[in-house]
Design a protein with these regions (language model features):
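Extracytoplasmic ligand-binding site segments that recognize negatively charged/polar headgroups
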Residues: 1-4, 14-151, 162
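Charged, often glycine-rich, active-site loop that binds/positions anionic groups
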Residues: 7-11
Length: 166
C-alpha cells in the first residue's frame, strides 16, 4: 500500500502532501515516521483544533458523514435515527453492510467505542450482526443497491455515494 511504497521510496519519494480517507490512515503515516511537522498560519487559522494533529503532522480538510440509508417504502421516517438502533431486534434480517474490516466501518466502530465504551460497542456489534440480511459484502454502493433490490431495508454508507448514484 501507500505506506510501504513511501517507506521504500524514502527521501526519493515524490510525495509532498498526502490526501487520504480517514484518521486511521493519517495516524499510520505518523506512526511510520512518514510525516513531518507543518507550521502554517493559514491552516492554523482556518482548520479548527479538533481537525488537526496537536503536533502539526496533519490537518483535516474535509469530513464525511457515514449515514444510515433506509428504504423509503419499507421504513417509516423516524423509525431509525441513531447508529445505536441498528442493534435493535426490530431490524433482524433487515440490514446490509460491507465488511467490518473496511476502514469506514472501523472508524464508525471506533466512534461507538469512544462514545459508549468497549463493552457497549461489543454488544452493539453482536446485535448488528444478528440483524444482517446477508453476509457482509460489496462496497457502499452495493449496500444501497441491495435496498433498492429489496434484499434489506437498511444499510450504512457514506453520504456522497448517493449523490454519485443519482
Amino acid at each position: 500500500g501507500m505506506i510501504e511504497r513511501m517507506k521504500a521510496e524514502g527521501k526519493r519519494s515524490p510525495a509532498d502532501i498526502v490526501l487520504t480517507v480517514d484518521i486511521s490512515r493519517l495516524s499510520a503515516l505518523v506512526d511510520a515516521g512518514l510525516t513531518q511537522q507543518v507550521t502554517s498560519e493559514v491552516l492554523s487559522k482556518n482548520v479548527p483544533n479538533k481537525y488537526r494533529d496537536p503536533a502539526g503532522h496533519w490537518f483535516g480538510l474535509t469530513t464525511r458523514a457515514r449515514i444510515i440509508y433506509a428504504s423509503n417504502e419499507r421504513v417509516k421516517t423516524g423509525d431509525i435515527l441513531k447508529y445505536e438502533e441498528l442493534a435493535s431486534p426490530k431490524w433482524k434480517g433487515k440490514i446490509c453492510i460491507r465488511s467490518g474490516l473496511n476502514a469506514y466501518n472501523l472508524a464508525l466502530t471506533s466512534a461507538i467505542i469512544h462514545h459508549h465504551g468497549e463493552d457497549y460497542a461489543l454488544e452493539w456489534l453482536r446485535g448488528l450482526k444478528q440483524n444482517l440480511a446477508r453476509k457482509p459484502q460489496g462496497n457502499d454502493r452495493a449496500q444501497v443497491k441491495a435496498i433498492w433490490a429489496g434484499e434489506c431495508d437498511l444499510s450504512i454508507g457514506n453520504t456522497y455515494y448517493m449523490g454519485k448514484m443519482l
